[in-house]
């Protein structure tokens, strides 16, 4: 799984990503031309072109703990929501600390559901009722 892949890779960060044919309110994983990690762009900050990307950041990470706190200290709130995004940490680890960033891709299915709005909460509750949970 994710933790085992992270440990084996020696990466500064391994992030969980998944694909979906449905437009979900998750950040998009952007890759460089060679397929390596570029950055995560939060859904609200995406361009229309980025919003069409179906590789999604699930928001679950493994970090090299000794690098995490210094990287958090370099976060800024220069984005549409004026928030500090944990999603910026992988790029900071790569760019400022020379850390390797890995992407662990998994089938999302309906196993991971984000709830950021009342509408998403309603959809999640309906899904769980239909499953009998």
How would you label these PLM feature ranges?
Residues 38-110, 119-132:
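Catalytic-core segments of class I nucleotidyltransferases/pyrophosphorylases
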Residues 1-34, 58, 62-65, 70-75:
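Conserved beta-loop-beta/alpha segment of the NTase-like Rossmann-fold superfamily
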Residues 1-4, 129-133:
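Short, intrinsically disordered, charge-balanced linker/junction segments flanking boundaries
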